[in-house]
Amino acid sequence: IARKLKTLPPVENENEFRSLLDKFFSFSLPKVFSAETLAIELAKRTRFLKEEVIHQELEDEENNSNQVLGFYDAFQKYLIAGLTKEDFADLYAQTIAYGLFAARTRTDGEFSRRLAYNFIPPTIGILKDVFQFISLGSLPQQMEVIIDDIAAVLNAADISKILQDYYKKGKGQDPIIHFYETFLNKYDPKTREQRGVYYTPEPVVDYITHSVNEILKTDFDKEDGFANTDVTVLDPAGGTLTFLAQTAKFAIEDFTEKYGEGHRTNFIKEHILKNFFAFELMMAPYAIAHLKMSFLLDEFGYKMKDTDRFKLYLTNTLEIEDLEQTRIPGMASLSEESKQATLVKRKQPILAIMGNPPYSIASYNKSVFIEEIMGLYKEDVKDEKNIQLLSDDYAKFIRFCHWKIEQVGVGVMGLITKNTYLNTSAFKGL
């Protein structure tokens, strides 16, 4: 046609065509992965899974056997009220990618989507339920192809070497978390900023942990600090458990130094696994954190059994809803998780609260519960013009911690926050 016309037709949809070519050629695997290149490859595929596959599945509402839509309904009804399809697609895609990553860290042999289920610890009930479908279920073809491809990337990568490289480069003692930061920055930096998801530097965590430990000893007469078996600890914005992992390590080392290794296993079982609590809203860091605690306790000679779990719950800290039980296949642990989290919020006495809550003035957290208890901080500033500043998530987390400590009457908080409350009149009530 071009020869007959003796002219070239005008270029149309050039950007879309280039984008298609980029996606096509980018799915070839490099021979050797660094942490950076692995994060990039996983991020590209996870973004594709979210935007081109899960989104499409969620729009197919006429398909009665659509399990992805069923999972969305279950998450919305039994875990995170008000969850949008867009947020679920993001949550679900990251869950699959990091669930595969978590499984891959537990084997040096051949790895695939179908084998992943065998390497998901039974203590992470929700993740185990998700992978019962991902690994063993009948997936939509386009979903199967992209998840198989993510598994192939992980199979080709030397995960142990990549994580060790973080140690060698002086990035600290938390390589899994540093890798997640790299992944998230490549995958969706905007969501990272909106959610206030940033890694907490280890020296800051050390400082706060040691400070709270001293306060427990001097002001609360807890001779062994965090190692006192009647001390309860909560991180309300657990993330990847940077704070509680350090606190647990600190407590175990203190206990061992003072009482020897003989009772250490029992100390971990009866104190660390019973009196340390955390909440997290995003499922990828939730999965990573469970993996991280399993590795940490393993370092101290404690192998987690099928009946053990660290008390980190997938929940919105600033929301308290009495949710009914679900019998949706593969989602049995979802309603149980919600139930356990609500019990901790309402009834579990907590003495020490530490963490790095999100900072976002455009807060997504507007539940009836948090808006009601924030009224206490607004009483003194009703005539202020800039009261919107009190809607920042970090202020709401401070109020939750305050409310939680009020249940007992005494307590200590060690939080990383913005400093706006120090010199802004809108925070007088706070």
Stretches with model-predicted labels:
Residues 1-4, 97:
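Nucleic-acid nuclease catalytic cores
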Residues 4-12, 32, 82-85, 111, ...:
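Short, polar/flexible loop-turn hinges at active-site or ligand-entry regions and domain interfaces
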Residues 11-250, 275, 279-285, 292, ...:
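Preference for the N-terminal adenyl/adenosyl cofactor-binding alpha/beta module
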Residues 171, 185, 189-430:
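SAM-dependent methyltransferase catalytic region
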